[in-house]
Amino acid sequence: MKNPLTLKIVFAVLCLLMLGLQLRSMSGWSESRGVFDDICYLRQAHLFQRFGLAGFDTDMSRDDDGYVRSKFREIGFPGWKDDKELPCHNTMAGTGKIVIQYPPGPGMVLALFPEGHQVVPLFWLSTIAVFAFACLAIFRARKPASIVVAGLFGVLAIYLMINPIKASYSMPPTAVICALCGYLTVRCFGVPEADRRFAPLVILGFVFGLSVDFRLANIFLCSGCSLFLLVDFLKSRHAQSFLRGAAFALALVAGMLPTLVSYWINTGSPLTSTYHGAPTVVPLDFTLSVVWEYLNDILQAALLALSIAGTVALWLARQGGLRRVGQLTAGNLVINLAFFLTYGIAVSYYTIPISLLSLWTSLFASVMQETETARAEAVTD
């Protein structure tokens, strides 16, 4: 197919077809699938809808309407009468409160929709956003091979919004954030130093901070950018490099404010996690059994392999911008894998965020480099 525009339209339509199939499948979902985490996320949303911003306080004393107890009773949980036995709730030593262990982000987003009809709109909007990013990559691509890669990855990214992202309500917003951060990372670090601007970097830091409000482990997603900014400052010792790093860090903290406020209210300190005392919190310890579990998960293993391949391709590229992004992405992968491979529990979606972030970053780096090259050639001509 010689006409790039025709090829772009073909793959955009393929992504649209996948989007339609996914939305149709999601439309039949139930909000009562008997998963403990689902109930806790929906309880946080219920608190925000009842109390507004006071919904940050998730103490079980606020369940005076019996919302969460009735949910656990409906699924046959034997300890539904005992607050201390409720899943994904922990007792905080500093306040004595029995609170939800998860960050408030999923509940805040779910609270935007009417009770009883919250999950499907969350997944619909997130999947539509991923489709939009896929189209952005497709139409930014210039070479036929890049258009094909962007289109195929777009179809895959939309497919992933059900399998395995359906496993947790924290994952749909995380998937969208990974796509946005992949784009912003290239805008911030894929250009020469003289062309770097503060605004995209501040936005990137803020969005990375927001990701922590959905999953605490998402804090590691910003490790590559943080490491790059630190090394850049240590090498140059320029005030400009310091200011860039400081702006990124401040924006990161600003994005995390909902989680910090939640911690402060529920634990008595913004630096004390509500996961304290949770049975799912285990010490870091490298074991081959965890590695084997991830390798046996074909989807996670395949996505990580693609992420590594894309990162290596960027690192070996001749263009300086691509190489910088490749180095940054490599650092990000190493730090994230170091954490998850030493965490004693392997779950079907734990490595999905770092894989998506790496793949979106690699994709946008490639297609945006083609755009810049085309512009430079046009100016030369």
Segments from the language model and where they lie:
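Membrane-lumen/periplasm interface segments of specific transmembrane helices
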Residues: 24, 218-219, 231, 243-312
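Interfacial juxtamembrane loops and adjacent helix segments
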Residues: 50-105, 110-113
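Transmembrane-helix motifs of polytopic, lipid-linked glycan transferases
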Residues: 119-144, 179-184, 315
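Hydrophobic, aromatic-rich transmembrane alpha-helices
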Residues: 127-137, 227-235, 299-336, 358-364
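Transmembrane-helix signature of polytopic, membrane-embedded enzymes
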Residues: 135-159, 176, 194-197, 323-327
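Membrane-interface alpha helices of multi-pass inner-membrane proteins
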Residues: 155-156, 197-215, 226, 253-254, ...
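Perimembrane helix-loop-helix junctions
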Residues: 183, 187-191, 220-253, 281-282, ...
